[in-house]
């Protein structure tokens, strides 16, 4: 595609493109909020649109302005080219990252048309779509599984395991909750319930305010309490 021509005066917006692969489906909205609060966004997020009967890889793409302090990294001559002062970022889950590579090689980037490639084996094409549907279900189910697990630990007063499964933050295996906090939660489950009801995105937002945080059970409780 030719940019900066009379027929297409648009500028290239993704000279720099970043792909971020996430563990969990609900991380998509968290990362979206982080980007919107950190950089100036152009237009809106481009996201997967599928009907109730369709299955497509879940991803979101956004275009943002370069902070002005980064302009000096590039030669001035470069900005005379049809290149916009923007970058593009894409978020997708780890399940769909693997799928994306297979799908592009075997479908979208193939020189053969999709109909020609699958001719005589339409049932296999449907099975491939079923695999995609299972990936979408896996993304959703994984989050729901840990939500239920955290609730079970809450009901059984397993406070450390409740925090680990609720917030899904990587921590040192030797991390332990302060005995005074354990005693407080054991004595008053309503207090423990307030921490159980906290949102994961709020914790991540607070962690991002720290320089090189080392997550632990005690730090989680402190940040959520503050």
Placement of each model-derived feature along the sequence:
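Active-site acidic/histidine clusters and adjacent loop/turn architecture
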Residues: 1-22
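Short, charged low-complexity intrinsically disordered segments located at boundaries
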Residues: 2-5, 62-69, 161-175
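An acidic, glycine-/histidine-flanked metal-binding catalytic module
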Residues: 83-225
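Long beta-strand-rich cores associated with HINT superfamily self-processing modules
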Residues: 15-143
